[in-house]
Amino acid sequence: MATLDTASDTASPPRAPVVRRSALGCTKVRDSCQSCATSKIKCPKEKTSCSKCQARGIECQYFFARRPGRRRENSTGHPTSCTSTSTTANSSSSSSRSSNSSSSSSTSPPSSSSSLSSNPEPTSDKDLPRPRSGDGAAANSTEPSILPPANNSVLDITPTDNVLGPYSSDLFSVLEDPSVFAPLPDFDSNMTDVDFSTMDYFEQPVMDGDNFTRALSDIGSLLIPETISFDLGALESDPLSASAVPSLASSVPTPSTAHSVTMMRGLSASISCRCVSQALDLLKALSAKSAPVSPFSGPGAASMTTMSSVQALMGENQQYIDNVSNLLSCSSCTEDTFLLAIVSMIVLKILERYASAARAQVGGGESDTGQRPATSMIPNGKDQMRPLGRIYSTGGRDSARSVLSELHRVQKLVNLLSPKLKKRQEADTRAFAHVAWGRHTVSNENDKALSTLLSPDTLAQMEGDMRKSLSSLSANIINRLRQD
């Protein structure tokens, strides 16, 4: 028959009574009385009896809330009176529990002690002792830990409460203390290569706008090249590319350039593809070279020299016309008004060179009036009639015929440029109309408000001057050839 072992019952004293929150004065009275809460109506919250209970003639009772909520601790880390009372009760219960476990382990047999160690009693976080900010070190040395010991082969770290005990409210001081990280197996306790100081970040000098922009430009210089140069040698070595692109227009961009959506994007794209700079270089080259208009006295070697110079001039003009055609084929800057204006001046300059070649005299006895001043960029009908009325010899008529046979190239160039000028003229006219009526935005994406400083009348005048100069030059050459 099994006997009842009363040794363990007599040896283990009874547990300490559990102190409830209601006994500590931490409960909270409900805002609504029991009658209003049961009836699901709004309570007037009148103590000690609400008006609704009085009107109904029933007893008004206020009960304690089931969830009173947590009490906040003060800034120094000390708990409130309710928390301190519960902490004291918990610490006393834990100390009595530890003494009971020690006495039971000394009196009980090894089997019972092993069973107790293998099955520890479940504890909650509120039963654990909380160290105070004043005596954290003492709490670590006197208060026992009821947590199971950690495995030393993995991590030998003290509990968090013991680590943060002397640093209850200063977390950064914990990071600055090297002894906290000493138990880690792969961590250097010297802390010479790690700086956890929080003030070093605020002591760094603030970077101003100039330094920040300079830093960005330094980074950009490593990623983006300063200049973009085209491989002209490979382009000229290709027979197809060399035949399609003239020698003077080897660096003119092709239609593969990215399309522009707005005027600012178009302007930036034109600057990146160097269309405007190429147009200015062409205009500068045309202005620097002079046409052979000086008369010669004899029909011998001088006639051959004049004809060769006229042929060279027409060859250069042909190359200039091809360059301008390539400029107009660039899709990224086709709406750039400044580029169109520069191209119009180039066309007028080419017509002026053709007129100078048509005025070249061979074997004449009279002297020509000479080249027209460089300031007269735009010729008119009377200006063309005056020099073209002095053709005396066969050499002069040959030069005029050669010029007349080349004017169809200029006609194609004007026909290519004219739609672009009209498109920009219409867009600028609508933009000026919007601004005149007080509208600062345009009706659609294609209309740009004040996209250029050139007025629409300027573009219309340039188109009219090109067509007038071309028709006047061809008509005068035909009339003089018929008269002679």
UniProtKB/Swiss-Prot annotation:
Transcription factor that probably regulates the expression of the gene cluster that mediates the biosynthesis of notoamide, a fungal indole alkaloid that belongs to a family of natural products containing a characteristic bicyclo[2.2.2]diazaoctane core. Its main location: nucleus. This is Notoamide biosynthesis transcriptional activator notL. Residues 70-154, 363-387 are annotated as: Disordered. Gene3D superfamilies: Zn(2)-C6 fungal-type DNA-binding domain. Residues 76-122 have a biased composition (Low complexity). It holds the Pfam family Zn_clus. Keywords: DNA-binding, Metal-binding, Nucleus, Transcription, Transcription regulation, Zinc. Notoamides have been shown to exhibit antitumoral activities. Notoamides A-C show moderate cytotoxicity against HeLa and L1210 cells with IC(50) values in the range of 22-52 mg/ml, but the IC(50) value of notoamide D is greater than 100 mg/ml. Moreover, notoamide C induces G2/M-cell cycle arrest at a concentration of 6.3 mg/ml. SUPFAM superfamilies: Zn2/Cys6 DNA-binding domain. Residues 33-60 bind DNA. One of its GO terms (biological process) is aflatoxin biosynthetic process. InterPro entries: AflR, OAF3, Zn2-C6_fun-type_DNA-bd_sf, Zn2Cys6_DnaBD. GO terms for cellular component: nucleus. It is found in: Nucleus.
